[in-house]
C-alpha cells in the first residue's frame, strides 16, 4: 500500500538530477545516435517515449503527435503533467530542471516509474539542447503553465501560470530542431507511422494519434488495440496462412531476484505466438517498448520453453521415441510468428548496440510463462498440438537432409579458393574491407562485367536465371539449389542458423540486374534470400543495388547516360534545340565492357543504392505478401501501390 502511495505522488522530489547539459550540442551523436535523418526521428521518439511512459504507468490514456510545416513538432498526453514546484537541488521550477539538466528525470526514482523506455528529463533535455525553439505547456489540477526556450535550451523567462484550463492534467511539448547542429532532412511519414503503430500494439488500450499537417491534404492516423500482442500477431500473419486460428498468448507480472545481486525487480512478461504454413520464423522481441533486434535472454527463455514442451508431447504421443534425436530450437521456430515483450525496471544489455537483452533473471521467468500457457494449449487442443508436432518433425527431417548440402557451403577459410564456386571470377585482394562482389544476371552480362571490372577489388558471380523463391521453400530445397549454394560459398558467411559475419569476404555485395520486369523479379528474389537467411548483411548495410543506365544520349561527340525517364525528359526540356541520338538499353548485355565500367561499376561515377531495413516487422510482412502463396492480399497490395511502386521502401 505504501509503495502505491509513493507512485501516486509525482512532484519535485521525484525528479533526480545527475549532471549538466553542456556536452550535448558539442557531441550530439553520443546522445541521439546521429545528426542525420535517424537522429532527427530520435528527437521525436525521446518526447513520445515520455508520454508512453506515463501511459505505461497507468497515468495517461492517449498520446498525440502532430507535425506542422517548418518542422514544428508537437507531442501531447493526458498524463499527470510535469511537476511545477521548485526543485530542491536547482532552485528552479521542476519543469525548467527537467528540460535543461541532462538526466534529470523520474527514471532514477523507482517510485515514479517502474519501467521506462524514455522519461521526463532523460531525453527531453537533450531534445531541448538540439532545438532552435522549445515550448512546454503543463496542465495540473485544471491550471495551465507555460515555459519556453530558444537556441539550444536557453530559457526565456520563468515558468508562468496562464490561468485555469478545462484540461485537468497533461503535458504538451513543441519543438523545432536546430539545423545549425542537425542535418536538414524531412521527417519520413512511413517511419513515424510504423513506430507509433508498433507502440500501440505493445501498449494495449492506449490510443495513439498522429496528425501530419505538412502537406496540402493533411493526414491523420489513430491506433488503439485492446487486444495488444494478439492483434499484433494477427497483423503480422495477415499475409500468411495460419496453421490454426487461435493465437497463443499470456501475460504475467512477477517479482524476481537479480542473479548475483541483492535486488528484486517487478517484471512484466507478455507473449503471443502463432504457427503458419510458411518455412520462415518471424520472432520479434522488446524490452520496455525498445526492439531488441539481436534477441537476448527473453528470447532464449521463450525458445527453450517451446523445445521442452514440443519434445515432451512428441514423446508422450508416440511421434518420437526416447532414444530418437530430439527436435531442436530451429525446428520449433519454423513457420512461427511470435512477439515477446517484457517491462523491466533495470534492463541490462550486451554489447555496444544495446540490441540484445542480458538480464539472466528474465530467462527462467519467460520460460515459465511460456511453458505454462503452451502446455495448457497443447492439452486442451490435441488436434492443433498434433499439427504443431508434425510441422516441427517435417522441419527436423528437412534439416537432417540438408546437412550434407550445408557442409558444402561452409569453408574452413573464407579465402580458400579450392572451395569457391567455379563460375566466380574472384578479385585479387584478400582485404574484405575494400573488396566487392557483383551478383550479375546471366552469363552474357557476367562475361561483360568480368572484362570491364577492376579485378583487384571487384569479383563477379553470374547467376543463371531466377534463383529459388526461398519464401516458398524449405531448408532442403534451399541447400540443394545450385545458384544459392554458389552464392553462399562466394560470400563466405554461411547462412542462418550458422551465419558468421566475421567470415564475410566482401564489404559490398552488389545486385546488378537488367532494368526490366525480369530483372526486378530476380532482384526481389535475391533480397528475399538475404533478408531471410543473411539478415545481418542487410542490417549492417552490406547489400547494394547497382543502377545501370536506361538511356544513352549522343550529341556533339558526347555521350550522356540517363537512369530514368524523368532524367531524359528534363534534359530534353533543357536542350530543346539540340539534335541527339537515343539508345535505350533493354539489358546489361547491350553495353560493352567499357560502358558497363564507366556507367555502373566505376566507384568514381556509379550510383549504388544501399539496402536498409527501418522496421524488420514491416519488411517481414512485405516479403510474405509479395513472395508468398496468398494471392488476394498481394493483388490488393499491387492495386493500392501500383502508381507509387518505385517508392516502396522496405
From Swiss-Prot:
Manner of cofactor binding, per the entry note: Binds two Mg(2+) per subunit. The magnesium ions form salt bridges with both the protein and the DNA. Can also accept other divalent metal cations, such as Mn(2+) or Ca(2+).
GO cellular component: chromosome; cytoplasm
Places the protein is found: Cytoplasm
Biased composition (Basic and acidic residues): 400-414
EC class name: isomerase
Required co-factors: Mg(2+); Mn(2+); Ca(2+)
Annotated Mg(2+) 1 binding sites: 441, 514
Disordered as annotated region, ranges: 400-422
Any one Gene Ontology BP term: DNA topological change
Domain Toprim stretches: 435-549
UniProt: Mg(2+) 2 binding residues: 514, 516
Self-association and partners: Heterotetramer, composed of two GyrA and two GyrB chains. In the heterotetramer, GyrA contains the active site tyrosine that forms a transient covalent intermediate with DNA, while GyrB binds cofactors and catalyzes ATP hydrolysis.
PANTHER family found in the cross-reference section: DNA GYRASE SUBUNIT B, MITOCHONDRIAL (PTHR45866:SF1), DNA GYRASE/TOPOISOMERASE SUBUNIT B (PTHR45866)
Protein name per UniProt: DNA gyrase subunit B
Lineage summary: Bacteria, Bacillati, Mycoplasmatota, Mycoplasmoidales, Mycoplasmoidaceae
Gene this chain is encoded by: gyrB
Amino acid at each position: 500500500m505504501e509503495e502505491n502511495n509513493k507512485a501516486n505522488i509525482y512532484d519535485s522530489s521525484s525528479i533526480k538530477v545527475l549532471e549538466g547539459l553542456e556536452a550535448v550540442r558539442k557531441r550530439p551523436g553520443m546522445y541521439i545516435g546521429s545528426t542525420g535523418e535517424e537522429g532527427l526521428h530520435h528527437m521525436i521518439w525521446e518526447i513520445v517515449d515520455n508520454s508512453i511512459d506515463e501511459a505505461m504507468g497507468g497515468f495517461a490514456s492517449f498520446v498525440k503527435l502532430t507535425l506542422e510545416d517548418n518542422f514544428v513538432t508537437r507531442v501531447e498526453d493526458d498524463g499527470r503533467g510535469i511537476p511545477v514546484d521548485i526543485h530542491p537541488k536547482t532552485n528552479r521550477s521542476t519543469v525548467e530542471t527537467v528540460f535543461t539538466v541532462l538526466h534529470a528525470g523520474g527514471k532514477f526514482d523507482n517510485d515514479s516509474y517502474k519501467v521506462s523506455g524514455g522519461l521526463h528529463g532523460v531525453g527531453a533535455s537533450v531534445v531541448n539542447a538540439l532545438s532552435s525553439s522549445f515550448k512546454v505547456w503543463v496542465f495540473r489540477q485544471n491550471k495551465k503553465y507555460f515555459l519556453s526556450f530558444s537556441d539550444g535550451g536557453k530559457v526565456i523567462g520563468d515558468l508562468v501560470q496562464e490561468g485555469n484550463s478545462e484540461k485537468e492534467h497533461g503535458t504538451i511539448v513543441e519543438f523545432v530542431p536546430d539545423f545549425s547542429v542537425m542535418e536538414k532532412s524531412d521527417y519520413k511519414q512511413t517511419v513515424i507511422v510504423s513506430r507509433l503503430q508498433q507502440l500501440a500494439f505493445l501498449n494495449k488500450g492506449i490510443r495513439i494519434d498522429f496528425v501530419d499537417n505538412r502537406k496540402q491534404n493533411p493526414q491523420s492516423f489513430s491506433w488503439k488495440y485492446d487486444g495488444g500482442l494478439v492483434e499484433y500477431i494477427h497483423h503480422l500473419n495477415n499475409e500468411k496462412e495460419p496453421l490454426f486460428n487461435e493465437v497463443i498468448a499470456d501475460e504475467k507480472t512477477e517479482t524476481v531476484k537479480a542473479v548475483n545481486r541483492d535486488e528484486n525487480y517487478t517484471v512484466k512478461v507478455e507473449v503471443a505466438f502463432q504457427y503458419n504454413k510458411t518455412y520462415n520464423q518471424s520472432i520479434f522481441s522488446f524490452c520496455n517498448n525498445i526492439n531488441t533486434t539481436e534477441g537476448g535472454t527473453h528470447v532464449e527463455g521463450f525458445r527453450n520453453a517451446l523445445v521442452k514442451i514440443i519434445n515432451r508431447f512428441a514423446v508422450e504421443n508416440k511421434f518420437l521415441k526416447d532414444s530418437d534425436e530430439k527436435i531442436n530450437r530451429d525446428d520449433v521456430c519454423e513457420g512461427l510468428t511470435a512477439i515477446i515483450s517484457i517491462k523491466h525496471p533495470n534492463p541490462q544489455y550486451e554489447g555496444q548496440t544495446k540490441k540484445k537483452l542480458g538480464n539472466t533473471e528474465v530467462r527462467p521467468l519467460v520460460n515459465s510463462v511460456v511453458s505454462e500457457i503452451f502446455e495448457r494449449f497443447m492439452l486442451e487442443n490435441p488436434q492443433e498440438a498434433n499439427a504443431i508436432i508434425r510441422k516441427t518433425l517435417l522441419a527436423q527431417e528437412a534439416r537432417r537432409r540438408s546437412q550434407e548440402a550445408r557442409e558444402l557451403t561452409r569453408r574452413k577459410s573464407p579465402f580458400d579458393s579450392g572451395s569457391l564456386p567455379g563460375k566466380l571470377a574472384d578479385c585479387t585482394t584478400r582485404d574484405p574491407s575494400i573488396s566487392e562482389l557483383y551478383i550479375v544476371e546471366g552469363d552474357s552480362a557476367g562475361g561483360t562485367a568480368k572484362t570491364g571490372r577492376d579485378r583487384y577489388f571487384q569479383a563477379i558471380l553470374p547467376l543463371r536465371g531466377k534463383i529459388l523463391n526461398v519464401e516458398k521453400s524449405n531448408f532442403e530445397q534451399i541447400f540443394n539449389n545450385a545458384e544459392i549454394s554458389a552464392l553462399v560459398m562466394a560470400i563466405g558467411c554461411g547462412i542462418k542458423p550458422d551465419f558468421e559475419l566475421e567470415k564475410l569476404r566482401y564489404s559490398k555485395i552488389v545486385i546488378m540486374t537488367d532494368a526490366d520486369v525480369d530483372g526486378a523479379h530476380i532482384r526481389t528474389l535475391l533480397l528475399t534470400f538475404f533478408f531471410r537467411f543473411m539478415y545481418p548483411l542487410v542490417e549492417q548495410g552490406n547489400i547494394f543495388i547497382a543502377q545501370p543506365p536506361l538511356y544513352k544520349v549522343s550529341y556533339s561527340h558526347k555521350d550522356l547516360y540517363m537512369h530514368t525517364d524523368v532524367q531524359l525528359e528534363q534534359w530534353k526540356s533543357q536542350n530543346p534545340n539540340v539534335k541527339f541520338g537515343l539508345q535505350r538499353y533493354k539489358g546489361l548485355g547491350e553495353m560493352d565492357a567499357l560502358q558497363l565500367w564507366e556507367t555502373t561499376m566505376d566507384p568514381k561515377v556509379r550510383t549504388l543504392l544501399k539496402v536498409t531495413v527501418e522496421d524488420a516487422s514491416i519488411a517481414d510482412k512485405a516479403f510474405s505478401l509479395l513472395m508468398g502463396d496468398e494471392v488476394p492480399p498481394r493483388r490488393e497490395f499491387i492495386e493500392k501501390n501500383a502508381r507509387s511502386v518505385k517508392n516502396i521502401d522496405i
